[in-house]
């Protein structure tokens, strides 16, 4: 019915409706532009609320009427329950629809005769009811066509079978298709079998490459290919002839694809409320991609964990040539790559837990791969992952009561943490925010220029405080990580299950002693004192104990009432053991640790050390350096040079005139305070070292011998002389043409030959006496 043919009442109603619609539209447009007053906006809200209330009430009334009608029907139902025997008799199973449907399904599976011939009229029960206007199953409606006479035709067509099936229904009945792994090649000869294997392997290589390229080209569209790669990782639908190489290729390819397509953020699972909301097509596609990626990422990690766990267990000494071991070690490497390359992504903490647990493996290759990955995580300064890793190691050590690999504890040394949070310092952000609101409140009483200036200054202060808070958060993670590291160290020291664990523990305490809380200082110093007096403790471990004590005493622990003289005596005595260490790596570690410790003892604390004590260390250090090979000797000579600079009065030890202290130097006494080293000189030792073939060692020795000049022919290259002794040795060792893989003992051999002529042997207790005689003979 049109407007012209309508009655007067209907015309008025239509005009009113159009006018209302236009008014509402104008009001909404003005509201968006914020040009309406508050009263008008409140009035519009009230009108909308009344309309929605009426609609809700109508829906409630309809629901109440429906419930009342159902209850009335149940009350009027006079049908009584039948006895059990009548119920049994009423069921004719053989002629029921369920039996007919089952028979048809069985015939279809067994390839029987056409089932249409045996269909009964009773099968109507199993068919879906079809209503008018409802499409048949498997059909879809196309765009309608309007003819000239106004008739609408709604064409339909059969749905195209989608190539992408539901991901969760990927398991297909084995009998429906001929799977490649069921093909029988037993009739082939050896050469034909090799050719067939090569063809199959190339076919799967092409398949893997195709899936990977599609994923990298468009991850959101082709994410289903990740499922196919995962199935190949499991060896599904792969012939046993090529299953092993295909699985390894698929594992490596899936790993690289995952690393390339994971986003730079952690995917958050949507809540039920978010899933029920209407979303844009782009948003929905992104959500589907993230869900699929996360699902198959988790499945891949679970597969890696399952394969790698086969390497761990009691009496698990795996043969490295077996397929199980190869897949296990490949899985370990995959887990390590993921956590190193994407520490921000989901399940990183789960990977860390798995790697820490894998460190219990008996195989050294597995332990090395795991520990290398953990070291890399520590070095990358991802403090959240560092904190979780430190906590996982601490938990494992406590749970296993210290029965873990020393390599696992050595990984803690790779933590790049040099500072921890100061809990006493508080942020002033709350005060600044309060001040900001106060300034805004007082805006009316200020000029615009003054208000803007104050607000800008306050905003700058807030940005600075927020940056400090971000740094404070990182410091908090670092503090927590160090807390768990110290907890691990104290747990091992408390139990001391094996001496193999002492070295990484003492080295860790030595490195991070400056980060210890002050309340632990006295306990640590007491523990180190008891341990260092153990004669069975290795020289390197003794140096770690001594260094830990002096790092504490050089910082906040200098106020402690502790006499360090006993630690000076212990350090003085341990120097005699260096020439007898034949392992190059161990000797290098000893020299580096000794240089660091002695610099703290004699240079950092130079105001608290008497000159006679420093002179005794100089004499013994140069004496020991004469029988060491070139690089360790250079490190010691560089350290002695820094002692001559820090203590200028040591110049009396290199002067020709007799002006030293009275008395005789007692080289047989292991107490630097009573050895009277100022009564001796070091010219013979320096002259011997200056004759070495190593150019840098000779230059350093001559520089000390001639009074540490900064100019002239005996000056040193500033780029080398400014380096720390252990850094200098490391650089020259790395730049050497031949690797430092063996200890040169020719100087010690000459010393032993000289002692043998007197029917004596060289030991740590008498080595200084024999060196003195040897230098006198060689002069």
UniProtKB/Swiss-Prot annotation:
Q: What are the UniProt keywords, alphabetically? A: Coiled coil, Nucleus
Q: Does the keyword Lyase apply?
A: no
Q: Is the keyword Nucleus in the record?
A: yes
Please give the coiled-coil regions recorded for this protein.
434-474
Query: Pfam family of this protein, just one?
Result: NOC3p
Tell me a GO biological process for this protein: DNA replication initiation
Could you tell me where the Basic and acidic residues compositional bias lies? 136-160
The main location is nucleus
Q: Can you name a GO cellular component term? A: nucleolus
Tell me where it resides.
Nucleus, Nucleolus
Biased composition of type Acidic residues is found at: 114-124, 161-178
Q: Region (Disordered): which ranges?
A: 1-20, 100-189
Q: GO molecular function: any one?
A: chromatin binding
* Similarity field: Belongs to the CBF/MAK21 family.
* Protein known as: Nucleolar complex protein 3 homolog
Q: What species was this sequence derived from?
A: Caenorhabditis briggsae
